[in-house]
């Protein structure tokens, strides 16, 4: 549209750039902190431009024995734990929700609606609301300090099921009729037709769930006492506490950077899918 | 709800829903009912005997000044985070909507805080505001403000509000931008021909037409502020100083796991449960009532 | 005075030029239709007049003012969009009043104008409804109402009838024409439908690929098309084009048949003959091998090929006529119905 007010365009870009600066500032500072040596990081004020110690800090953080004063596993080990947990949660949620949505939408069986509402109820029970009792259950089942304990209690929530249900409802009936004529039974239909048609949604959901899983904090905090099982997101808090005594901010910030990188990378790389998934899930 | 063309009943659907139902029962329904049950109990200090006391735990809570303060604090916190985060996102999305090319670039650069865990966000902000080393205390000192959120309750609250809002801007921005981009261009052009300038167009047309999104985000942001911010509090202030940043969800954790007051913590959980249910019902009600074109 | 002058207009997106030196003079009160196939640039041209697209080169004047630099709101124009662009959250009354409200016209005056427009368009019972409660035709009228109340110097229409069903389209077409005649406002109307163009316009501007093929009255375009494009675009069914040679006042077709005519053209030509200008005649020069006949009731369309060639032809005959497949029927062109075009440029050859 013709708008002979070029000043407005300038303001637009200025505001947006300001927004980006505000949004990116904490991450920039973290990055800068991760590139200096420990001594520099104890002098106020902290630097605003990167230093030269990036690789040094990187290797020391990744393979070192953890920060002094904390009880954490080596960082590479924690990254692995986080990865395992995030993948299990994401893939677990997707798998369970796919088959549940399939059953609810495509089968007429007794108690169908009862199951539907049961699943719906989980939307209203985030983990923070049931932490103590859930902890007890997990402990009773002997699942503390395990990958199973980290992931299973989190994979039954309803958002994924609802999204798949919505997707399945929009698939034309003729698909099923034509598959039946071709002789496909329910599982065949599910595997050969439904899943390929839902591919983009599965991918979008994967991004969201991976981030959800990776960023879990309260739950891993509660159920892991074994240092080998700590996740990297958990460890940040402990490192902050350790900073009271012997501040090694460069290591802490490098760890924070490493903790942030995988989810941020996944979001940016699959941005289009992610946005689509987000704006369609929460409806 | 059910497809017109569907399969008849058999063993298969039960097998398909079994995993989710099983996990739901074991890890959701059972613990939730346990929480409700425990909220009616008082255990003695050694955990040896339990007494069924009906609503006594709830009565104690309602009379507990600290609990009420925490409740009020949480509401304040929620409102501040929602207003700050949604307001900034609205402005940014409004400007991004005007950019013909490059809207996607700005979006890419804006969305990464979504991927950052709340506890990490807290860590980053506490680092920036560290009383001895942080860049902001340094700058604030130059204008005569002494920053130490370890001692000053209001400053601590301000810090967690900013950290929580910062993280949510990305999410709100995405939804607002999507809503604005779904408004037909010809509508805006018609308003321009009618004589409305950019500000007028935004106030008269764009903002009213994205009101469903605003309602939706209000609920989402409220739920976020109530529950997902545990990590931020834990990382930044641990509820302090002097409980000035203890919001409800943090109190549940603190009283339960650290203070070992199982009955009281369970009662708090139940109250939170009721709140979530109320908010979820509101959310679904509003989504049903979407404004039609 | 609200005449419109288009002076050598060029529109380019980056390096791609989409409108090439479009020029024309529109008189006050004229109803001009810009017509052409999809992608020919007609909407772009309209939007340039409206101020919704920038002008790369050339000038647009409304009345005495050059308006290139003016915002849409300052050009004193009103526009009816293809999808009506009504404000969904406002009532019909508020939709129509909006532009006046912004210009700070008094409440009484606004009410008066809105009621007047509502009367003309028969929208009285709907004034307090929202757009989603109206039918397509009603929404269309609200869009026009919004334009009328502004009393602008120019009306701009961007394919306003495309979203209506065929019957409604015919009805609304007439209403738009009557309205414009009554109000006497200079109007530019864009459409891809040549029937709409012929019935609505005082003059038509035919655009093709960003070029103005011809700018004249409907009858001018029908009787003396300037190019093969215009000849084939105006008139339905479309004109028949036959390769031929002209010499000494007569035209010889590819199969040797000779048609007498007047004129000084000679050399290879493209002969244009409208389907309705061929009269059945036992001894006529134009002989067609029949493929099939479409019966339309009022007339019949005969499809076939020029005898001895592969060239497809259509002949329109009045009333119910039938013919057997593979039969040959002979025709004579009516007087003055031969159109000769240059086979390479497509331009009309002067007679």
Swiss-Prot record, chain C:
Source organism, top-level taxon: Bacteria
Described purpose of this protein according to its UniProt entry: Part of the ABC transporter complex UgpBAEC involved in sn-glycerol-3-phosphate (G3P) import. Responsible for energy coupling to the transport system.
InterPro entries linked: AAA+_ATPase, ABC_transporter-like_ATP-bd, ABC_transporter-like_CS, ABC_transpr_MalK-like, ABC_transpr_MalK/UgpC-like, Mo/tungstate-bd_C_term_dom, NA-bd_OB-fold, OB_MalK-like
Topology within the bilayer: Peripheral membrane protein
Family matches, as SMART domains: AAA (SM00382)
Gene coding for it: ugpC
MF annotations from Gene Ontology: ABC-type glycerol-3-phosphate transporter activity; ATP binding; ATP hydrolysis activity
PROSITE patterns, per database record: ABC_TRANSPORTER_1, ABC_TRANSPORTER_2, UGPC
Compartments it resides in: Cell inner membrane
Protein name per UniProt: sn-glycerol-3-phosphate import ATP-binding protein UgpC
Catalysed reactions, as listed in the record: sn-glycerol 3-phosphate(out) + ATP + H2O = sn-glycerol 3-phosphate(in) + ADP + phosphate + H(+)
Disulfide partners: none
Xref: Gene3D superfamilies: 2.40.50.100, Nucleic acid-binding proteins, P-loop containing nucleotide triphosphate hydrolases
Enzyme Commission no: 7.6.2.10
Sorted UniProt keywords: ATP-binding, Cell inner membrane, Cell membrane, Membrane, Nucleotide-binding, Sugar transport, Translocase, Transport
Every ABC transporter domain range: 4-234
Subunit structure: The complex is composed of two ATP-binding proteins (UgpC), two transmembrane proteins (UgpA and UgpE) and a solute-binding protein (UgpB).
GO biological process: carbohydrate transport; glycerophosphodiester transmembrane transport
Family (UniProt): Belongs to the ABC transporter superfamily. sn-glycerol-3-phosphate importer (TC 3.A.1.1.3) family.
Lineage: Bacteria, Pseudomonadati, Pseudomonadota, Alphaproteobacteria, Rhodobacterales
The keyword Membrane is assigned to this record: yes
């Amino acid at each position: 549209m013709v708008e002979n007010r070029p000043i407005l365009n300038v303001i637009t870009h200025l505001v947006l750039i300001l927004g980006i600066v505000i949004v990116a500032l904490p991450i920039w500072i973290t990055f800068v902190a991760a590139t200096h040596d420990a001594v520099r990081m104890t002098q106020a004020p902290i630097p605003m431009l990167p230093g030269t110690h990036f690789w040094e800090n990187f290797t020391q953080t990744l393979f070192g024995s953890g920060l002094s004063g904390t009880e954490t596993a080596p960082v590479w080990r924690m990254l692995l734990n986080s990865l395992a947990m995030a993948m299990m949660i994401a893939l677990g949620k997707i798998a369970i929700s796919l088959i549940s949505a399939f059953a609810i939408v495509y089968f007429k069986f007794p108690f169908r609606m009862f199951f539907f509402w049961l699943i719906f109820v989980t939307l209203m029970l985030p983990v923070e609301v049931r932490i103590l009792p859930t902890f007890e259950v997990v402990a009773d089942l002997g699942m503390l300090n395990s990958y199973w304990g980290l992931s299973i209690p989190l994979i039954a929530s309803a958002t994924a099921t609802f999204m798949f249900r919505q997707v399945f409802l929009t698939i034309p009936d003729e698909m099923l009729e034509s598959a039946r004529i071709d002789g496909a039974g329910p599982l065949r239909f599910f595997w050969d037709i439904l899943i390929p048609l839902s591919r983009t949604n599965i991918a979008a959901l994967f991004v969201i769930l991976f981030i959800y899983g990776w960023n879990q904090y309260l739950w891993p905090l509660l159920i892991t006492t074994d240092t080998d099982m700590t996740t990297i997101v958990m460890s940040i808090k402990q490192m902050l506490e350790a900073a009271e005594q012997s501040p090694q901010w460069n290591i802490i910030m490098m760890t924070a950077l490493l903790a942030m990188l995988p989810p941020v990378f996944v979001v940016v790389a699959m941005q289009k899918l992610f946005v689509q998934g987000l704006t369609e899930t929460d409806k | 709800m059910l497809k017109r063309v569907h399969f008849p009943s058999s063993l298969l659907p039960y097998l398909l829903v079994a995993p989710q139902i099983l996990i739901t029962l074991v890890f959701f329904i059972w613990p939730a009912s346990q929480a409700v049950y425990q909220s009616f109990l008082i255990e003695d200090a050694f955990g040896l005997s339990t007494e069924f006391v009906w609503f006594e735990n709830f009565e104690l809570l309602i009379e507990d000044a600290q609990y009420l303060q925490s409740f009020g604090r949480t509401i304040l916190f929620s409102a501040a985070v929602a207003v700050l985060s949604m307001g900034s996102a609205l402005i940014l999305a409004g400007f991004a909507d005007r950019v013909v090319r490059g809207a996607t670039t700005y979006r890419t650069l804006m969305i990464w805080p979504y991927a950052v865990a709340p506890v990490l966000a807290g860590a980053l902000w506490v680092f920036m505001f560290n009383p001895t080393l942080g860049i902001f205390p340094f700058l604030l000192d130059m204008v005569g403000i002494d920053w130490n959120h370890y001692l000053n309750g209001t400053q601590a609250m301000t810090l967690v509000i900013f950290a929580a809002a910062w993280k949510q801007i990305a999410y709100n921005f995405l939804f607002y931008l999507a809503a604005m981009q779904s408004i037909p261009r010809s509508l805006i052009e018609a308003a321009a021909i009618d004589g409305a300038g950019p500000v007028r167009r935004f106030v008269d047309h764009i903002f009213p037409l994205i009101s469903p999104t605003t309602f939706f985000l209000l609920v989402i942001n409220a739920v976020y502020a109530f529950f997902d911010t545990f990590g931020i509090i834990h990382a930044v202030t641990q509820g302090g100083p002097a409980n000035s940043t203890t919001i409800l969800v943090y109190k549940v954790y603190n009283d339960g796991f650290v203070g070992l007051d199982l009955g009281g913590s369970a009662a708090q959980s139940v109250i939170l449960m009721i709140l979530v249910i109320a908010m979820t019902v509101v959310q679904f009600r509003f989504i049903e009532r979407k404004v039609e074109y | 005075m609200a005449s419109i002058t288009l002076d050598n207009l060029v529109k380019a997106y980056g390096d791609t030029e989409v409108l090439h030196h479009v020029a024309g003079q529109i008189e006050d009160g004229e109803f001009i239709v810009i017509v052409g196939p999809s992608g020919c640039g007609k909407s772009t041209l309209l939007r340039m007049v409206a101020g919704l697209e920038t002008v790369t080169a050339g000038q647009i004047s409304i009345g005495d003012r050059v308006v290139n630099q003016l915002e849409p709101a300052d050009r004193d124009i009103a526009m009816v969009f293809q999808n009506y662009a009504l404000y969904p959250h406002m009532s019909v009354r508020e939709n129509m009043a909006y532009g006046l409200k912004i210009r700070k016209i008094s409440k009484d005056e606004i009410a008066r104008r809105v009621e007047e427009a509502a009367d003309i368009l028969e929208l009285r019972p709907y004034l307090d409804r929202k757009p989603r409660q109206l039918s397509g035709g009603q929404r269309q009228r609200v869009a026009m109402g919004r334009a009328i109340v502004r009393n602008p110097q120019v009306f701009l229409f961007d394919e306003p009838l495309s979203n209506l069903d065929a019957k409604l389209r015919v009805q609304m077409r007439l209403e738009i024409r009557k309205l414009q005649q009554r109000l006497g406002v200079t109007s530019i109307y864009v459409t891809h439908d040549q029937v709409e163009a012929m019935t609505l316009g005082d003059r038509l501007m035919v655009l093709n690929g960003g070029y103005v093929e011809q700018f004249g009255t409907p009858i001018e375009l029908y009787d003396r098309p300037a190019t093969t494009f215009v000849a084939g675009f105006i008139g339905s069914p479309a004109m028949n084009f036959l390769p031929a040679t002209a010499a000494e006042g007569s035209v010889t077709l590819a199969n040797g048949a000779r048609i007498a005519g007047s004129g000084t053209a000679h050399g290879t030509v493209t002969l244009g003959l409208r389907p309705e200008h061929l009269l059945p005649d036992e001894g006529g020069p134009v002989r067609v091998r029949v493929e099939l006949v479409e019966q339309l009731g009022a007339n019949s369309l005969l499809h076939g090929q020029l005898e001895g060639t592969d060239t497809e032809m259509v002949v329109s005959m009045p009333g119910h006529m039938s013919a057997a497949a593979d039969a040959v029927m002979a025709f004579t062109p009516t007087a003055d119905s031969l159109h000769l075009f240059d086979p390479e440029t497509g331009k009309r050859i002067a007679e």
